[in-house]
Amino acid sequence: MRPRPCSILSLDVGRRRIGLAGCDALGISVTPLAALRRGRFDADLVVLQAHCCERSVQGLVVGLPLDAAGQPTAQAEHCQRYGLRLAAALDLPLAWVNEHSSTWAAGEQFGLKGDRSGRLDSAAAALLLEQWLAEGPELKPAQQTASRSGAGAGDGGS
């Protein structure tokens, strides 16, 4: 089911960088943004708050790297913790999207294989956002998604 369009910040959370992408309030155009080099959470939060204010963000889409069987990986658990903490700090609802193979797909689609500048991470975040706009799930408050690891992220994958 397609979610209600709104201004979204999509995150492809990695250990070194966070790929970022946003969409307009109507969900028509998806734009990769400059990737964020990971630092302390408080420093990341300042940058992400600025993006949210500048873009009037109403929700977050966070990629969960599930395995081929749709099960959470160790990195998925890290992404979920980060996404929940960020959503709570920003007081924004969020949705999870299965990001299985999204980086590979972004590398193929945009000719960015092997990129280490962050462009590949943000291209993957853009694919996650396009997937969310097409398939959902609806955004939910962080506390409603906390107990359901991978909820809504098992379908599809990019």
UniProtKB/Swiss-Prot annotation:
SUPFAM superfamilies per UniProt: Ribonuclease H-like
Summary of the function given for this chain in its UniProt record: Could be a nuclease involved in processing of the 5'-end of pre-16S rRNA.
Xref: NCBIfam families: RNAse_H_YqgF
Keyword Metal-binding found: no
Protein name stated in the entry: Putative pre-16S rRNA nuclease
Biological process according to GO: rRNA 5'-end processing
Gene3D superfamilies: YqgF/RNase H-like domain (3.30.420.140)
Domain of life: Bacteria
InterPro entries with a match to the protein in the record: RNaseH-like_sf (IPR012337), YqgF (IPR005227), YqgF/RNaseH-like_dom (IPR006641), YqgF/RNaseH-like_dom_sf (IPR037027)
GO cellular component, one term: cytosol
Disordered as annotated region, ranges: 138-158
Enzyme class: hydrolase
Keyword annotations from UniProtKB, A to Z: Cytoplasm, Hydrolase, Nuclease, Ribosome biogenesis
Protein family membership: Belongs to the YqgF nuclease family.
Main location: cytoplasm
PANTHER family, sorted: POLYNUCLEOTIDYL TRANSFERASE, RIBONUCLEASE H-LIKE SUPERFAMILY PROTEIN (PTHR33317:SF4)
UniProt EC number: 3.1.-.-
HAMAP family: Nuclease_YqgF
One of the record's GO molecular function terms: nuclease activity
Subcellular location: Cytoplasm
